[in-house]
Design a protein with these regions (language model features):
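Short, well-ordered alpha-helices that flank and scaffold nucleotide-derived cofactor binding pockets
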Residues: 41, 45, 84, 88, ...
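Phosphate-handling active-site elements
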Residues: 52-58, 87-98, 112
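Short coil/turn connectors at secondary-structure junctions
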Residues: 1-2, 12-13, 61, 90-92, ...
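DPxDG-like acidic metal-binding loop motif
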Residues: 67-96
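Surface "functional belts" at beta-alpha junctions
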Residues: 22, 28-34, 93-149
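N-terminal beta-alpha supersecondary unit
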Residues: 1-70
Length: 151
């Protein structure tokens, strides 16, 4: 089993997740543009909820994942910097995850009868990133390129 820390800050919601020995811990907050203020306290709260000391958390982590967008460029940089810092301290792998693919995968697991999913991620004001995914035996696969559209 992989012990994983996940960080997503590319949108208005700041999310962190930790999976250690099959136990899952998750925190999400609607923070708009305060990711830089909330991310580290959320990571600390997650670590405490998991009952791990700081050194113990760094010892058990195999990988650190972060949402690489699309979304806020500053938000992606915050997640990437935090993931890089934790992974470096833990000697863990860094994994970049497409935010639209992760969203589509989660939606496809809830929509049992759907053959595909379209993800829409707000960029700013009336601009949205859209991507179409089809369901596969092991998840989802993008079938239409990511597009930025005005709504």
């Amino acid at each position: 089993m992989v012990n994983l820390l996940a960080i997503e800050t590319s949108g208005a919601i700041c999310s962190v997740g930790l999976c250690v020995d099959g136990n899952r811990f998750v925190r999400s907050e609607h923070v708009e543009k305060k990711h830089n203020e909330r991310l580290l306290p959320m990571l600390e709260a997650l670590r405490e909820e998991a009952g791990l000391s700081r050194p113990a958390l760094l010892e058990v982590l195999d990988s650190v994942a972060f949402g690489r967008g699309p979304g806020s460029f500053t938000g992606v940089r915050i997640a990437a910097a935090a993931a890089q810092a934790v992974a470096l301290a833990a000697g863990a792998n860094i994994v970049r995850v497409s935010s639209s693919e992760a969203l589509s995968l989660a939606a496809s697991r809830q929509l049992i009868d759907a053959d595909g999913v379209i993800s829409a991620i707000r960029s700013r004001r009336d601009l949205y990133y859209l991507a179409a995914y089809e369901r596969t035996s092991d998840g989802v696969q993008r079938c239409e390129q990511l597009s930025l559209i005005h709504i």
